[in-house]
Amino acid sequence: MNITFIFILIFGFFNTQKCSKDYDHFDDEDLALSIPKNAIGVPKEFRQQVLKEMKLRNRPNDILKNRCYCNYDQSICGNNMTCVKQDGAACYHAVEEVYNKAEKRMETLHKWGCATLERGSGASHLTCNSWRAAHHSPKSIGCCYEGNYCNKNLIPPAYVHHHKEKALQEKTDNPEDYDSPLENMTRGGKMFIMVFATVMSVFAVIGCIYLCITRAEEKSKARARAKTVSLKTESTYMESKSMLEDSGSGSGQAALIQRTVRQDLTIIKTIGQGRYGEVRKALYRGSYVAVKTFYTTDEDSWKNERDVYQTNMINHENILQFVAADIWSEEDSMTKMLLITDYHELGSLSDYLCREETLTTDEALRLIHSCICGIEHLHAAVHGTGSFRKPEIAHRDIKSKNIIVKRPNVCCIADLGLALRYQNDKILPEKFNVQVGTKRYMAPELISNKLNPKDFSQFKMADIYSMALVMWEVAIRVEVNTCEEVLTVDETSPDHSASSGIGESVSSSGNISRMHLQKTNVEGHSTSLKAKQHVPPFDGIVHNDPNFDEMNDVICVRRIRPPPDLAWKNVPALNELSKLMEDSWHSIPHFRHSALKLKKEMAELIKNPDRQNQSQRKVEFQQQDSGLVESATNQS
């Protein structure tokens, strides 16, 4: 280590001597002006690059507007004393008072050229404002952006913080003070700088090595912990086996967050088009994914959806699984933002309902139940171990096109670009528009702009209204071709009297024999429900793209809702479902069911779809039994 340190010191000392000998005073003039070295223009490469960029941007007529007058040598300015600036950059005219040692007098040095285009500002502000600072010798610079040799007759501003007469006297009396700064440095000062720089470099290298070793150890420990957890939990093993086979659930963040994901994507085809961009099917490391593309004008929506997907404990069976987010520049030089999720072949719920195949009652109930489970998970605040906590989330754009069918009878909620989070007693993002979403599915309080944005529960109730319309879309695709089971009395039973229903119903032992019931298919009681073609809510009532005034008249003033099918009353499950719809799209938000209430009701309806008939039969049995007992008592 000591030998290496001494070698570095010796090498630095000789390198300093070489720099001192080769120092060029003309370069010092440019550096003192704070003009970047490539501001003057690079002879051929720079001109070719600018011309190439202009051709790519289809603006060949702008070349004349980018030409500046240049008085440097031919290698920089070319044959016609011209340099070409970038779009947005400036042409400059710089002046400096230089002391002529041979003639012992001050001379004004003029320089014309092209300034560089600074990153971030889209102009040449730093170069053009360098005259405002004090310099070792009088300097100034003037800029113009019009091009077309606008700097040729440009007059720079007056010198700042320096008087010409005083500068001339100082240079005449003490010309050695205006030599190169490196020449005025003592040999001891140079050595001190070299030693200090070398020592700091050594410490920096040691620090970097230490950080690399520490991070490697932390990653190794993290992998070991993850491996231990995967051996203990079967769900984690299934998730690692196939990331795209099942969305799974968990308390961590989403699967991948990388800036290099696009390089591993192989785009296959376009599968959809939305208001923010397009959705394409792609292959990512051997698995199919859906790539949602956002344009730069919708960057806020991309950031919000990415942040929602990265929320702790967001993973759920009925929430579309997030894979990664990335920013990429396509071949057309347009920057696009990518959001990558699981790909599901069945597509959206709207596409699924448009198929020729109809739904059974059980299929419809399970599709609706899975959607409500996803919404309930979004609406609920989940507290995990430690600091893990999932905030309440309102979707704000529930519709059949934003619901994906993962597999038969199972849906998941997608498109969280407009979602809001209620975290730490405040709504995120802090700046948002209240009246957003699809107008056809918007709740009355949103259409009439009466929703209180400070009450987060009202956003969740608006989701319930939208979900009720989706429930109606699913229900109209149900087709039932069965005969209803009707309770009748067996008139041939010896224990039954045709006139009163009592007769010889009491045996000699005093026991009451129950009325004989049988299931028969009675003409006029058959249930035949034909499925209707899938249409969006309020189809035929409003236009394809209704405005707020039209929707306000329909759902707020006239209070129109999608009509239920009259045949639903003959199907117990659909009859109960229609009641849930009516409660959920109520005009008053607080009268609607919560997502948790709907989730429980749908689970019970799936478990017991004939509960309405059974409850009616139970009442009939109780009435019949009470009538028999009363008759028997009177006879006795």
UniProtKB/Swiss-Prot annotation:
Extracellular-side positions: 21-190
Biased composition (Low complexity): 497-510
GS domain boundaries: 235-264
One matching Pfam family: Pkinase
Class of this enzyme: transferase
Active site: 397 (proton acceptor)
Residues with attached carbohydrate: 80, 184
Name used for this protein in its record: Serine/threonine-protein kinase receptor sma-6
Topology in membrane: Single-pass type I membrane protein
Classification via SUPFAM superfamilies: Protein kinase-like (PK-like), Snake toxin-like
Molecular function GO terms recorded: activin binding; activin receptor activity, type I; ATP binding; BMP binding; protein serine/threonine kinase activity
Example of a GO biological process term: regulation of cell morphogenesis
Reaction catalysed by this enzyme: L-threonyl-[receptor-protein] + ATP = O-phospho-L-threonyl-[receptor-protein] + ADP + H(+); L-seryl-[receptor-protein] + ATP = O-phospho-L-seryl-[receptor-protein] + ADP + H(+)
Signal peptide: 1-20
InterPro entries: Activin_recp, GS_dom, Kinase-like_dom_sf, Prot_kinase_dom, Protein_kinase_ATP_BS, Ser/Thr_kinase_AS, Snake_toxin-like_sf, TGFB_receptor
Organ and tissue specificity: Expressed in pharyngeal, hypodermal and intestinal cells.
Domain Protein kinase: 265-606
Annotated GO CC locations: activin receptor complex; nucleus; plasma membrane
Region (Disordered): 491-510, 608-636
Protein task: Serine/threonine-protein kinase receptor which binds TGF-beta-like ligands dbl-1 and perhaps daf-7. Upon ligand binding, probably activates a TGF-beta-like signaling pathway.
Family: Belongs to the protein kinase superfamily. TKL Ser/Thr protein kinase family. TGFB receptor subfamily.
Presence of keyword Transferase: yes
Keywords carried by this UniProt record: ATP-binding, Developmental protein, Glycoprotein, Kinase, Membrane, Nucleotide-binding, Receptor, Serine/threonine-protein kinase, Signal, Transferase, Transmembrane, Transmembrane helix
Main location: membrane
TM spans (from-to): 191-211
Domain of life: Eukaryota
Species, as recorded: Caenorhabditis elegans
